């Protein structure tokens, strides 16, 4: 679904983003410094986050711009870079905060960062001083089997299809 917002004074959620043609999910919102613009990932199919794109949207005007094809879970780094996940790696691209535009080529920064191919989530964060923390692991398919686990640890498979389950 599209993203929604609630005033700091409370009230009902209001639509913030609307799908462009072919989009079916907006996820991983992150405010840019100043709080007047928002980064997010827009996907065309929930099962293919490698085809997602990174988008920026002005909260004042609603104007949006596509920034990166094939990226998800965007964040702004204090170094002046837009950082995002792509295929189990983090990439960084120079970003002009005033013009809300990418100003250079993307470069890989960290390989082997855990990323869900099911929902596009990339497990990383920055501190206020720019330090990066992440979970190692690369792309994870999310395919799993449901089992009963006894108190002694033995597993009994359930008659359920193997697929990406969430909890």
Residue ranges and their predicted role:
Residues 1-3, 20-41, 63-85, 113-133, ...:
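Conserved beta-propeller blade repeats
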Residues 1-18, 34-66, 80-108, 131-132, ...:
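Beta-propeller blade-edge and WD-like acidic-aromatic loop motif
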């Amino acid at each position: 679904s599209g993203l929604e917002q609630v005033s700091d004074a409370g009230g009902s959620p209001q639509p913030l983003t609307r799908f462009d043609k072919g989009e079916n999910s907006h996820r991983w919102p992150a405010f840019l410094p100043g709080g007047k613009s928002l980064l997010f990932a827009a996907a065309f199919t929930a099962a293919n986050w490698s085809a997602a794109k990174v988008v920026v949207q002005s909260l004042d005007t609603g104007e949006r711009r596509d920034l990166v094809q094939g990226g998800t879970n965007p964040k702004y780094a204090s170094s002046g870079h837009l950082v995002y996940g792509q295929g189990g790696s983090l990439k960084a691209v120079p970003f002009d905060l005033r013009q809300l535009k990418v100003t250079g080529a993307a470069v890989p920064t960290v390989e082997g960062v855990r990323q869900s191919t099911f929902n596009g989530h990339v497990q990383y964060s920055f501190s206020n001083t720019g330090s990066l923390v992440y979970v190692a692991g690369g792309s994870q398919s999310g395919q799993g089997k449901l089992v009963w686990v006894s108190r002694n640890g033995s597993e009994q498979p359930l008659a359920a299809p193997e697929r990406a389950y969430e909890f």
